[in-house]
């Protein structure tokens, strides 16, 4: 079982991310230059954390993504996905089964909070 979106949000806040935007579909979180989204539609949590596409390669050494991409018009801080029928913003979705695993991933990807 994966962490629910609200649980992912709590871990992000614990490691120093702050809420930037709240929409019907997503929470946007910022820490310095780093930006992530919590997919509020991920009821089972498999795609609850969405990272910027430029982090895909570095992230792959830390965790397997849930799928190649996740598109959503609410991910305004991320680039547009132009290959689809509708041009929406996109990121790389991940799911985590424990808070410890998510914290380890975030610290590996973004470094420890200062």
From Swiss-Prot:
Pfam families: DUF2002 (PF09400). Coiled coil: none annotated. This is Uncharacterized protein YgaC. It comes from Escherichia coli (strain K12).
């Amino acid at each position: 079982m994966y962490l629910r979106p609200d649980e992912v949000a709590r871990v992000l806040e614990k490691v120093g991310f702050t809420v930037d935007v709240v929409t019907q579909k997503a929470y946007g979180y910022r820490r310095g230059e780093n930006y992530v989204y919590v997919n509020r539609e991920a009821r089972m949590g498999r795609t609850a954390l969405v990272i910027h596409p430029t982090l895909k390669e570095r992230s792959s050494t830390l965790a397997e993504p849930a799928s190649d991409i996740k598109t959503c018009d609410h991910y305004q801080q991320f680039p547009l996905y132009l290959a689809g029928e509708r041009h929406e913003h996109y990121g790389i979705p991940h799911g985590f089964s424990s808070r410890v695993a998510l914290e380890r991933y975030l610290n590996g990807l973004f470094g420890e909070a200062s």
